[in-house]
Design a protein with these regions (language model features):
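Alpha-helical membrane segments and immediately flanking helix-loop junctions
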Residues: 3-66, 179-200, 206-232
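Transmembrane helical segments that form the transport core of multi-pass membrane transport proteins
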Residues: 127-208
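Intrinsically disordered, low-complexity non-transmembrane regions of multi-pass membrane transporters
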Residues: 95-128, 268
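C-terminal transmembrane helix pair
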Residues: 84, 201-268
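Alpha-helical transmembrane segments
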Residues: 72-88
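Transmembrane helix-loop junctions in multipass membrane proteins, especially transporters and channels
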Residues: 68-69, 87, 91-103, 153, ...
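Juxtamembrane loop-helix boundary motifs flanking transmembrane segments in multi-pass membrane proteins
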Residues: 19, 37, 111-126, 139, ...
Length: 268
């Protein structure tokens, strides 16, 4: 297989791309708990299936923040390409043919349970799990929004901005973007909102930084994923490595698309 993952792993990738953070990680963890995939295969899934959803990228970021659906589609294309690239790179993560788990084995072990379980119980468990996940996501967003406000009011954010100034100078990125970038590293939505609102003659910088933050996810998303993965025997390392690589690749793909297709050239 392209990702060295059983076919059922495609469900985690598709749902992760469609539903946004942290659905991919939750599905990968559930696969491990139910022995659908081996530990190594689930860790590979963790590295690339946890992504921002198209509704958030196109609707919230593209249309609401940047005022352009084209920018939203540009960010989405780069995001997906980067995710697939990371998945291909991680196909060799702890690769061992003996570690593969047969889906037939899973079916034989759990067929009786699936038959006995009634529809009401299944729906109830799904709804309960969904509500808990939504509350967790909302709680993290609120907490980190408060943290950002505290950092901003206490001038700690200003200190952090000065720390990354040499890097921004090296990359020829205006210092006006530093606050938005740091905010995005902490909490993705707040950071993207700041970056998209900065008036800059070269809009490509806004888009490139947004692409990086969208793929990285930030500390808030990382802790969401960690709270899910901690309930299993999976390592969080593939997720960390994968998100860093995805952020880099996503930025590169965005840069290539902007400079290769006139429809994506937003230099004003």
């Amino acid at each position: 297989p392209f990702f060295n993952i059983p076919g059922e792993g495609s469900f985690a990738l598709i749902m992760g791309l469609l539903s946004g953070y942290p659905v991919g990680a939750k599905i990968a963890t559930n696969f491990r708990k139910n022995n659908i995939c081996s530990k190594e295969e689930c860790e590979r899934l963790l590295s690339f299936t946890n992504n921002s959803g198209p509704l958030f990228i196109i609707g919230s970021v593209g249309i609401s923040m940047f005022g352009s659906s084209v920018i939203g589609f540009l960010l989405l294309i780069s995001h997906i390409l980067a995710s697939i690239t990371v998945g291909f790179i991680f196909k060799f993560w702890k690769y061992n043919k003996k570690s593969k788990t047969s889906l037939n084995t899973y079916n034989s072990k759990h067929s009786n349970t699936l038959n006995i379980s009634n529809l009401g119980e299944i729906l109830g468990n799904c709804i309960t799990s969904s509500i808990n996940t939504i509350l967790m996501i909302g709680g993290f967003v609120v907490i980190f929004s408060v943290i950002l406000s505290i950092l901003n009011s206490s001038n700690i954010l200003y200190i952090l901005c000065n720390l990354i100034k040499p890097i921004f100078d090296l990359l020829h990125i205006p210092q006006t973007f530093s606050a938005g970038f740091i905010s995005g590293i902490i909490e993705i939505t707040n950071g993207l909102n700041i970056i998209s609102s900065i008036p800059e003659k070269q809009l490509s910088i806004n888009i490139l930084l947004s692409s990086f933050i969208l793929s990285l996810g930030g500390i808030s998303v990382f802790l969401q994923v960690w709270s899910i993965v901690a309930k299993s025997d999976l390592s969080i390392k593939p997720y960390i490595y994968g998100k860093i690589l995805q952020a880099i690749f996503s930025t590169i793909y965005t840069f290539i698309l902007i400079n290769s297709f006139s429809i994506f050239n937003f230099n004003l």
